[in-house]
Regions:
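Minor-groove-contacting beta-hairpin "wing" of winged helix-turn-helix DNA-binding domains
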Residues: 5-12
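Generic C-terminal helix-cap and adjacent flexible tail
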Residues: 96-101
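A short, conserved structural fragment
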Residues: 1-2
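Non-DNA-binding regulatory cores of transcription-related proteins
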Residues: 16-95
Length: 101
């Protein structure tokens, strides 16, 4: 980025509040399975795709989600409690099946 006549690095703008249609599209294309486990939701993706899905989850700003951890093909979604994990799991299952509103 050029600023004040000098070239330098800049962080990308933070995109917040991913629209539900974007979340649904990413989940339809990249998610293989979703499973609640206590206060976690475990999401499986094809190899190398977990980070892509994790970014969209982080941008979704769901209040039930405390945070995400992404590996190569697995995402752990930490929820605020087991009830919240069930809510998030149901919402993400709906996104994966194209029924998210």
């Amino acid at each position: 980025v050029r600023r004040d006549g000098h070239l330098g690095y800049a962080l990308p703008d933070q995109v917040r509040g991913a629209p539900s249609h974007r979340l649904a599209a990413v989940f339809r294309d990249w998610v293989r399975s979703i499973e609640p486990a206590a206060n976690l939701v475990v999401i499986k993706t094809p190899p190398g795709s977990a980070h892509l899905v994790g970014v969209v989850l982080d941008q979704s700003e769901m209040p039930e989600i405390a945070g995400t951890i992404c590996g190569d093909d697995t995402i752990f979604v930490a929820c605020r409690g087991s009830r919240e994990a069930e809510i998030v799991s149901s919402r993400l299952q709906a996104a994966m099946s194209g029924k998210l509103q």
